[in-house]
């Protein structure tokens, strides 16, 4: 037998087998030549589920979506050259949103590097600081030591991806020709396999009792506190953070991505309309918390971020399992390295029930006044983008997922996704907040989250049209609501809007595309709705039937801006009147 083929087969077979032993059982493969042996072995292994995606940029985000939904590592495989470079945006998003991706790039052997060989470029540390670990794998070799090396390297790599903060890792595989493994070899998957699988077991960081005692002592004298839950708050936090809020009397400002706004849990302490009422100047000047405790990433709301920045005399506690200093407001006074649930449990063990005061009641009252005013838009006949969110939530079934694209959809979700007893998961790409790869991420998530509705603007939809291929290839079920305002709607809300002379060409960027034919090219159904009743019917139909369904609702940027501003202005008047009445 050819010694090279034997080495290639056993060495890479050990690697693929070890991935599955470590519960990395999903791989997104971008077709190519140099990655042939790994791709074939993955397809052959009974423990591996493979997904083909021919566009590497979309493939990267597709894998990201699977990993986000499954909450476990997913592998991503491509050939050498620019194929690997096209994974870069998804790797950046995975790094900043703390999603474990196992990026596998095939490469030319060392003798073909830097000599002008075709499809060869420097892939060493290709993703720079956006991966937690880079490993240049050794060339295949037929020896027990190298089979063991393949498995041990896999174990270390997966451990790195899973340890807090979770994130992407990169393995680069130089491979010589010929590239076809020999599947007739005996015990193809067993080489280097020991009795045990070595992997770092995850556990909670225990909080020092001295710190807990000190914190409890301080909090007991701080009646005006806030609990802020952002994207990435651990699902286990729901019950315990509610108990902490009840004991302290601190309102919970829950970002939609915290998934605390919906479900059958007690939401008495949850505040959902802060993004609107924190725009009120009188409220911002008179409501001064003395402690803020934050879990997860910084919330979507700019109004909340600005409010936090102004609380310069308050104690700001950021809880982060990795201990990383995630504080874009630059006000953190303490960063506590602990899991969200561990921090809450430690407080609950020693925290007395604090004396009731008016603090929580103030927040609850203004929140209810704000929600009541905002809900007036539910009577609008005009195509208002905020109503897109409320009407989708209205028809979504129990257990559904709402994926909000970046730009306006996530902001409208923040403003108009009100608390609900229906269990609806909200997802988004808020690592680096780009508009690229949104369709692909949502499609990846739809493998696990069914039904899933994606809300996306027309520019973001255009940006990732190639991603629709995955729906056809893998027979995925998804409903995509395209809010088509013919351009970048968010810029109408920003200072750039005042530069009328160049606004449309540089920021409004109307592209005037009709998406019906491209959706049908990918085997999907397309409907352009006429009125809100028709909109709700189409969304509901999409969630109940298989396949790709695209529902387009056309809005006018100018009208949408006007309606947002009118609604905010009316809400500000209601809040100011309420605050002035309380002060008399």
From Swiss-Prot:
It catalyses: isochorismate + 2-oxoglutarate + H(+) = 5-enolpyruvoyl-6-hydroxy-2-succinyl-cyclohex-3-ene-1-carboxylate + CO2. Keywords: Magnesium, Manganese, Menaquinone biosynthesis, Metal-binding, Thiamine pyrophosphate, Transferase. Pathway: Quinol/quinone metabolism; 1,4-dihydroxy-2-naphthoate biosynthesis; 1,4-dihydroxy-2-naphthoate from chorismate: step 2/7; Quinol/quinone metabolism; menaquinone biosynthesis. Its cofactor is Mg(2+); Mn(2+); thiamine diphosphate. One of its GO terms (biological process) is menaquinone biosynthetic process. Pfam families: TPP_enzyme_C (PF02775), TPP_enzyme_M_2 (PF16582), TPP_enzyme_N (PF02776). Its EC number is 2.2.1.9. InterPro entries: DHS-like_NAD/FAD-binding_dom, MenaQ_synth_MenD, MenD_middle, THDP-binding, Thiamin_PyroP_enz_TPP-bd_dom, TPP_enzyme_TPP-bd. SUPFAM superfamilies: DHS-like NAD/FAD-binding domain, Thiamin diphosphate-binding fold (THDP-binding). Binds 1 thiamine pyrophosphate per subunit. Catalyzes the thiamine diphosphate-dependent decarboxylation of 2-oxoglutarate and the subsequent addition of the resulting succinic semialdehyde-thiamine pyrophosphate anion to isochorismate to yield 2-succinyl-5-enolpyruvyl-6-hydroxy-3-cyclohexene-1-carboxylate (SEPHCHC). Homodimer. This is 2-succinyl-5-enolpyruvyl-6-hydroxy-3-cyclohexene-1-carboxylate synthase. It comes from Bacillus mycoides (strain KBAB4) (Bacillus weihenstephanensis). The lineage of its organism: Bacteria, Bacillati, Bacillota, Bacilli, Bacillales.
